[in-house]
Amino acid sequence: NGRAAAAINERKQKGDFLCVICGRLNKPLADAVGRDVMPVEYGIGYTGTFSNYRVFESYSHMHMVWAAQGGFDPDGKFYDVAIPNYFDSGDYPSSTEKGDYFLYLGRLMKRKGVAVAVETCKRLGAKLILAGQGVKEVKGNRIECVAGEVFEGDHLEYVGCVVGQQKADLLRNARAVFTPTFYVEPFGGVAVEAQMAGTPVISTDFGAFTETVEHGKTGFRCHTLDQFVWAAKHVGDLDPWYIRQRAIANYSLGRVRWMYQEYFEMLHDLWGQGWYELHDDRTNLNWLCRY
């Protein structure tokens, strides 16, 4: 932080933004840079925030942090916003012809809900491909995780950690992607990546999934095993083209950049008349639209 602060102080101009992540770990940097630069925390999916200007990954997480920091009945903050993570749609080719498997992509740990995906596919007699970190040992169809969980069954296949083309192919060819996270997910990028590839998502019904998964359109949000099983049986009824187009409309680079544009213009006004600044040339308020 000390070296970074020295370098920034040599180059900064009044009115610059200091965009930081990692929360309170970067507070010493913001303090050292001074008041003529505005510290902005972006991509917040954690709780240890410090800045007065914050961009959260979802409304769900923003509200949770407000409650954690402000008590049971907190006031909102005008310069806190929810702007989702962004994706390059070119990284996620889509396919209307799906394979014979379901996919779980993420850390293999209890709180990620892996057991829900395993049990759902077991009840259906369907293949489940598991990909991600957290596996200690694989012996045949027995998968032992670092955290202690053991998953076993003829319907399971573990393919390790995947990136690039292998990841893209797994996403676009899956019948659906499971994201049955137990904790209140700040964002859950895999759910959006799957939809970018035109693949339905089967998730829990809390956290950011209530914002990213359009129930009955781009996937299903579930509470019980019965609901997870029904969802897995009916994901083929959903339209891959619609799923992909909605993801692009809401989470592509071209979309999210306008949300940041509006937000930084709001902050820039604070160097002038602040909250009371008017813009007679404004033509829309589309930055908060969802498509």
What does each model-found stretch correspond to?
Residues 1-291:
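Catalytic cores of nucleotide-sugar-dependent glycosyltransferases that transfer UDP/GDP/TDP-activated
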